């Protein structure tokens, strides 16, 4: 059963392979539509930074390129959403779910999603972007070995999520190989079809 505190939330799932530009485009969604942006990855990294026992366990999993258990991610997302709703927030952009069970459970226990934005770009482009980002980021998962694992995880687990939501006519697939602004123009145009203005 969905959480009544979140019944009016407008949630957009944002998907795409590692390095597809999800974070950059979510920043633009925040600026244009005044969405709040929740990234399961950012929430997990914040937990790691806290130095808590759970954070240390999560750090080891992330360094190995493993997926964090669904219950942990869902609890972090739900807590963050409820905290933001106290600030009268009704729109969220979430870089989630990575696998089908996560999406189904999120919609059952938290709230339904309005639509899913899927950023589509070749692995070669994503790899180049990630290695470039690694030059300045402190992310433990921006290295060649982990990048390969992340691509495999995306292909095996996240693509079925996209297919599931396509059957519900909720997927917006965006070619994410262009410039940041050109990509966002496409996002903006497609979101209007779902009433986001």
Curated annotation (Swiss-Prot):
Name the keywords, alphabetized. ATP-binding, Cytoplasm, Kinase, Nucleotide-binding, Transferase
Outline the segment boundaries, as ranges, of region: LID.
Answer: 132-142
> Looking at the keywords, is Membrane present?
no
Q: Mark the transmembrane ranges.
A: none
Positions of AMP binding: 40, 45, 66-68, 95-98, 102, 139, 150
As for what it does, the entry says:
Catalyzes the reversible transfer of the terminal phosphate group between ATP and AMP. Plays an important role in cellular energy homeostasis and in adenine nucleotide metabolism.
Kindly provide the name given to this protein in its UniProt entry.
Adenylate kinase
Q: Where does this protein come from, organism-wise? A: Schistosoma mansoni (Blood fluke)
């Amino acid at each position: 059963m969905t959480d009544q505190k979140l019944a009016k939330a407008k949630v957009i799932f944002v998907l795409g392979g590692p390095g597809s530009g999800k974070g950059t485009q979510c920043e633009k969604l925040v600026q244009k539509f005044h969405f709040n942006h929740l990234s399961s990855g950012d929430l997990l990294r914040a937990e790691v930074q806290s130095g808590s026992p759970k954070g240390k366990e999560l750090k080891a999993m992330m360094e190995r390129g493993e997926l964090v258990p669904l219950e942990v991610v869902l609890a972090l997302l739900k807590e963050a959403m409820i905290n933001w709703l106290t600030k009268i927030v009704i729109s969220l952009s979430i870089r989630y779910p990575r696998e089908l069970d996560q999406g189904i459970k999120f919609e059952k226990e938290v709230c339904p999603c309005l639509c899913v934005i899927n950023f589509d770009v070749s692995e070669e482009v994503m790899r180049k972007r990630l290695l470039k980002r690694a030059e300045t980021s402190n992310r433990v998962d921006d290295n060649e070995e982990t990048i390969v694992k992340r691509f495999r995880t995306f292909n095996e687990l996240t693509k079925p999520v996209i297919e599931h939501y396509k059957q519900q006519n909720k997927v917006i697939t965006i070619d994410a190989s262009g410039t940041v602004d050109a990509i966002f123009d496409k996002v903006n145009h497609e979101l209007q079809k779902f009433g986001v203005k």
